[in-house]
């Protein structure tokens, strides 16, 4: 028996009958993509939120960035927090998914290079290795490639199929890698 989502009206203005409206089929992969998007998107959102409201706030985040060799640390702290919050929310909602994924990839590549690469691969190593941030980048790229699924804003507005597959993979990779390389080239000046 088909599940019913709502009751609609059918007929003319003079004669209308209430009829059941079947639910659209939701595949297990759509539910899995929703869970992945929410987990990683909300997680990234809270990283950005913490940069603003946690511990030392933006000033503390800026000092931390300066200690790693980032130029204009106050600006970098604001940009990182804003990007984490906005891309996290967009990714969780499945809105502009490959663009949000590109922002996530860029953030994670910069974090991997600046904060984690000297600590090895594993996150449990002292100073935390680059395993975790690389995993986030790979998940973001995979979701951009697969598409956000039916349970997404992109699907609801009819653009999900336009941006998945190679197009989604390309958008996310170019934005992420290009953004990370640009930021590192312009802003990263480690002590020698």
Model-based region annotation:
Residues 46-49, 69, 90:
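Short amphipathic alpha-helical interaction patches enriched in hydrophobic/aromatic residues
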Residues 2-56, 60, 74, 78, ...:
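Extended, low-polarity transmembrane helix blocks
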Residues 62-72:
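Perimembrane loop-to-helix junctions flanking transmembrane segments
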Residues 82-92:
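Hydrophobic, membrane-inserted alpha-helices
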């Amino acid at each position: 028996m088909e599940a019913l989502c709502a009751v609609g009206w059918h007929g003319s203005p003079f004669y209308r009958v209430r009829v059941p409206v079947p639910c659209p089929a939701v595949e297990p992969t759509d539910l899995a993509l929703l869970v992945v998007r929410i987990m990683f998107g909300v997680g990234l959102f809270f990283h950005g939120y913490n940069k603003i409201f946690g511990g030392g706030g933006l000033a503390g985040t800026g000092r931390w960035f300066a200690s790693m060799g980032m130029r204009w640390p106050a600006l970098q702290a604001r940009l990182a927090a804003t990007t984490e919050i906005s891309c996290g929310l967009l990714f969780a909602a499945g809105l502009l998914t490959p663009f949000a994924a590109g922002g996530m990839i860029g953030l994670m590549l910069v974090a991997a290079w600046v904060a984690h690469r000297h600590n090895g691969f594993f996150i449990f190593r002292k100073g935390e290795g680059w395993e975790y941030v690389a995993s986030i980048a790979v998940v973001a790229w995979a979701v951009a490639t697969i598409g956000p699924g039916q349970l997404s804003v992109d699907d609801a507005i009819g653009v999900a199929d336009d941006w998945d597959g190679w197009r989604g993979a390309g958008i996310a990779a170019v934005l992420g890698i290009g953004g990370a390389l640009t930021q590192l080239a312009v802003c990263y000046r480690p002590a020698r």
